[in-house]
Amino acid sequence: MAIIILVTPEDKVPWAMGLYQASMVMGLVFGPLMGGLAADLLGYRAPFIMFSALTGLCMLGIYLFMPNLQFEHKVDARESQLSLIKSFLVIPRVRLLVGLLFLCNFGITGIGPILPLYIKHYMHMNDEFVATIVGIIIFGAGLFSALASISIGKITERLTMPCIVFTATWAVGTLFILQYIMPSIWGLGIFRAIAGFFMGFITPIANTLISKAVPIERRGIVFGAVSSVAMMGNVLGPVLSGMIARAFGYGAVFWSTAAIFFVAALFIYRSLVIPSES
């Protein structure tokens, strides 16, 4: 991500972050799909060979086509990594946006483990079709998320980034509630896809705002830490969602996630939207 920020002109950063996020989401969507097809057609060892070859091609492409990039602005070699991380965590805007990235990944992955069980227990679906329906729902959410990420460049020309990220965060919270109250599987799937669309705005814009809030020479270490926090959201999302579902029921996962997004939206409004309008 730091390389993308380095080679992209400042006015094109939102577009670049959107394209990066779209490619990540589509990889997460199509990876299991292609792996499953390869396993069914060629055997369970085939996906390992196929993705090893793909990784090798990526490495070869980087070696052959990636230019030797050098940061013009370098940090003092005497500064430790910990001190560099602390230097950006003291910035309130950066803390808020990093927390938002964690929350977004938490919301995306947290619902995944309980979704098949929720559909099976509350929507009385045949066990034979639950896995297929969940796959379709996840694919739809990922596809709409990628479409939103790609369109960020044009949308930021009309609306401010704080306004977009506030609207998207509030909309995601509302859509989690709508997913819970839907009586049919198709209603759940539609609102899950719309929630994926709004989630597609959050990560690229948050990354863009972070890049604008820190000095150029510190963007590399900042985005390294940001990636770590985002991955923690991927890890803790399923764990905490499972604990909530066990203690309070499957519906509590939807309500708790929605509540967290609403709280995040209020912080965004106070810390980003109001200062940008004044």
Regions found by a protein language model. Give the residues of each.
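C-terminal membrane-cytosol helix-exit motif in multi-pass small-molecule transporters
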Residues: 54-72, 267-272
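Short amphipathic helix-loop junctions that connect adjacent transmembrane helices
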Residues: 114-131
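Cytoplasmic helix-loop-helix junction between adjacent transmembrane helices
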Residues: 1-24
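Structural signature of the two symmetry-related core transmembrane helices
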Residues: 52, 163-177
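Intracellular juxtamembrane helix-capping segments at the cytosolic ends
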Residues: 1-8, 201-214
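Pair of pore-lining "gating" transmembrane helices in MFS-fold secondary transporters
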Residues: 91-110, 193
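Helix-to-loop junctions at the C-terminal end of transmembrane segments
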Residues: 148-160
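Juxtamembrane intracellular "pre-TM" segments in multi-pass secondary transporters
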Residues: 68-98
